[in-house]
C-alpha cells in the first residue's frame, strides 16, 4: 500500500494536479495538514470534500509532530493521502514524515505542486537572484529572535533578494495553559507585511549594522496564487501603512535589480497620495 503526500498548490480546491486528484480518489483515507499553511481564500474543508467526494481528516500539529502513528498504520494496509497546502516539502515536518514511513517500509509517493518558493516569481524578480530565505516569527515581550539578520546581511552584501516567510500561529497554546496542561488554544494569528517591516526595522535599530533601512526597496505580497492576489512594491517606509488584506502574506527585501526587474518593480509601485 502507498502513502501519498500531495501538494494542493496555492489557490482553491481545483489547484490539485490530475495525478494528485487520482491518488486522492483511490485512497481509503485522506488527511489534510492544517497548521504550516492556510487553504486559499474562502476555500473550506467542505469545498475540498465536495470536489474530491471524500471525507477529510484534519491532521493538526499534535498529530503530525507526534509521528502520525494512526496514519502510518493505515498506510500499511491501504492507500492513504496526506494533503499539504503548497508543495509537500515546504516544511521540514513533512520530510520527517517520509523518513518515518521509510523506516516502516511503507512506500511513499510525493506529488508536487506550486509553493510560495516558486510562485514568488510573480513579482518579477528572477528566482536565481534570491539568497537565503528567512522565517520571521512573531516577537513577544521577552523574545525577539534575530538570527535571520545575519542571513539578510549576507544576501545584501551579495546583492541578492531575500524572501521572508511570515509566521503562522494555528492551534497554539499560551505558556500558562501549556504549563498547566490545559488543552486551550489561542486564536489563529497570521503575520502581516506591516508587522514584518516593524520587526525588521526594530532589529536594525538594535543591531545598527546598516544592513537595510526604511528607504530600502521591498515588495509585499498577499494571497499569492489566488484570484485576489496582491503585489505592492516600494520602500519599507511606504509599505508600512499599506493594507495588504487577508492572509497569507509574504515579504521580499530587494537586492540589486536587473533593469527588467526594475521595470517590473515599478509596475507594482505603491500609489502615493
Curated annotation (Swiss-Prot):
GO terms (BP aspect): methylation; protein histidyl modification to diphthamide
The enzyme's E.C. designation: 2.1.1.314
Pathway connected to this protein: Protein modification; peptidyl-diphthamide biosynthesis
GO molecular-function terms, A-Z: diphthine methyl ester synthase activity; transferase activity
SUPFAM superfamilies on file: Tetrapyrrole methylase
Highest taxon above the source species: Eukaryota
GO CC terms: plasma membrane
Keyword Transferase assigned: yes
Entry keywords, A to Z: Methyltransferase, S-adenosyl-L-methionine, Transferase
Catalytically driven reaction(s): 2-[(3S)-amino-3-carboxypropyl]-L-histidyl-[translation elongation factor 2] + 4 S-adenosyl-L-methionine = diphthine methyl ester-[translation elongation factor 2] + 4 S-adenosyl-L-homocysteine + 3 H(+)
Pfam families with a match to the protein in the record: TP_methylase
Family according to the record: Belongs to the diphthine synthase family.
Protein function: S-adenosyl-L-methionine-dependent methyltransferase that catalyzes four methylations of the modified target histidine residue in translation elongation factor 2 (EF-2), to form an intermediate called diphthine methyl ester. The four successive methylation reactions represent the second step of diphthamide biosynthesis.
Listed name of the protein: Diphthine methyl ester synthase
Source organism: Dictyostelium discoideum (Social amoeba)
Gene: dph5
Amino acid at each position: 500500500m502507498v502513502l501519498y503526500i500531495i501538494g494542493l498548490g496555492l489557490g482553491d480546491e481545483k489547484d490539485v494536479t490530475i495525478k494528485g486528484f487520482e491518488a486522492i480518489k483511490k485512497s481509503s483515507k485522506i488527511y489534510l495538514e492544517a497548521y504550516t499553511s492556510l487553504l486559499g481564500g474562502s476555500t473550506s474543508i467542505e469545498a475540498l470534500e465536495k470536489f474530491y467526494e471524500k471525507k477529510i481528516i484534519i491532521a493538526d500539529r499534535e498529530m503530525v509532530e507526534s509521528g502520525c502513528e494512526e496514519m502510518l498504520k493505515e498506510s500499511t494496509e491501504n492507500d492513504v493521502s496526506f494533503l499539504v497546502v503548497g508543495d509537500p516539502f515546504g516544511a521540514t515536518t513533512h520530510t520527517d514524515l517520509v523518513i518515518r514511513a521509510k523506516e516502516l517500509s511503507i512506500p511513499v509517493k510525493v506529488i508536487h505542486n506550486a509553493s510560495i518558493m516558486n510562485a514568488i516569481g510573480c513579482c518579477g524578480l528572477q528566482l536565481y537572484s534570491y539568497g537565503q530565505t528567512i522565517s520571521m516569527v512573531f516577537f513577544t515581550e521577552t523574545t525577539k529572535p534575530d538570527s535571520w539578520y545575519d542571513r539578510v546581511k549576507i544576501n545584501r552584501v551579495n546583492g541578492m533578494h531575500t524572501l521572508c516567510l511570515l509566521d503562522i500561529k494555528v492551534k497554539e497554546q499560551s505558556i500558562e495553559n501549556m504549563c498547566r496542561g490545559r488543552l486551550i488554544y489561542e486564536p489563529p494569528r497570521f503575520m502581516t507585511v506591516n508587522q514584518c517591516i516593524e520587526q525588521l526595522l526594530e532589529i536594525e535599530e538594535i543591531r545598527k549594522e546598516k544592513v537595510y533601512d526604511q528607504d530600502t526597496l521591498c515588495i509585499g505580497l498577499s494571497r499569492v496564487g489566488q484570484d485576489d492576489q496582491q503585489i505592492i512594491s516600494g520602500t519599507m517606509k511606504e509599505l508600512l501603512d499599506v493594507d495588504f488584506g487577508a492572509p497569507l502574506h509574504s515579504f521580499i527585501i530587494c537586492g540589486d535589480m536587473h533593469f527588467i526587474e526594475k521595470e517590473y518593480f515599478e509596475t507594482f509601485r505603491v500609489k502615493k497620495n
